[in-house]
Amino acid sequence: IVSMAMNGVSEGESHSNPHINETCCAYNLLKLTKDLNCFNPDDARYMDYYERTLYNQIIGSLHPEHYQTTYQYAVGLNASKPWGNETPQSTCCGGTGSENHVKYQEATYFVSDNTLWVALYMPTTLHWEEKNITLQQECLWPAKSSTIKVTAGEARFAMKLRVPYWATDGFDVKLNGISIATHYQPCSYAVIPTRQWKENDIVEITMPFTKHIDYGPDKLPAEIASKDGHQLETAWVGTLMHGPFAMTATDITNWTEATLNIDSRLASITVVEPNGPQTGTTGNLYTLMQGGRTFQ
């Protein structure tokens, strides 16, 4: 279930645990997704998938303190990440693992003759050579808001900004301080029609993270849920999500402990905001609290 929620890929690769992800598979599917998006950039499902895989598996495959990456990315009860690949020659995931973490920005923008698509929200600078215009995007990662500013040049084009599938409440786009719409459809693109862009034009995007449950496509069989000796019935299971992030608790060891008593509005889940405006492995991190359990 967690594997599907984070868009993990693989099934028993290298005769290992059958429910484990391979970093190289995610890497290759992101390349495919980026190319498919070029053929149909108005379909936000491609970049929703891309964002979720990038943020959960790819970024999660890098050791937070020193250079190590994952080959197989274990998820589930009592799982831990098998770090390795200190040199790129160790495995295929060592080579692609080195590449993964220097190209987060490569699918942020897409362009046609007269349209700019903003597909991801992260600190980046775009120089559109054909239009001779430069735009700078500023935000903290993970981004609940972002600002895009024209820093040099003038050009005429339309701008389309992705409304993530999880942005179901409070999403807004402002152009020079004025909202461009009163309603935004999740998993779509908000459109600023063709106009003359000039230096100091500013686009502000607000996208509060929303709590939701990403349910599996079928029920968890009772025989699997009861393997640890706790007798449970066949039931629907899902992953607790905060925006695009699959949240995990580090102290759950069996399916009984993983059972949460929540209502359909998720009102019992409390969001703990980050302590300070930081980007990195220890900053700008969100925590969810429910029934005495902590999810990060």
What residue ranges belong to the model's regions?
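C-terminal beta-rich recognition modules with glycine/proline-rich loops and embedded aromatic residues
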Residues: M47-N56, S61-K149, Q185, T206-Q296
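Structural helix-adjacent loops and short alpha-helical linkers that scaffold large soluble proteins
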Residues: L36-D48
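Solvent-exposed beta-strand/loop surfaces of large extracellular or lumenal domains
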Residues: T168-P193, I213-P221
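Surface-exposed beta-strand/loop patches in extracellular or lumenal glycoproteins
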Residues: K149, A155-Y165
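Short beta-strand/loop motifs in extracellular/secreted proteins, especially
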Residues: F157-M159, D169-F171, F245
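Solvent-exposed loop and edge beta-strand segments that line ligand/cofactor-binding
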Residues: I1-Y27, G84-T96
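C-terminal beta-strand-rich structural cap/linker in extracellular carbohydrate-active enzymes
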Residues: F157-K160, I192-T210
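Well-ordered alpha-helical segments within folded domains of soluble proteins
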Residues: P18-N37, G94-Y104, F209
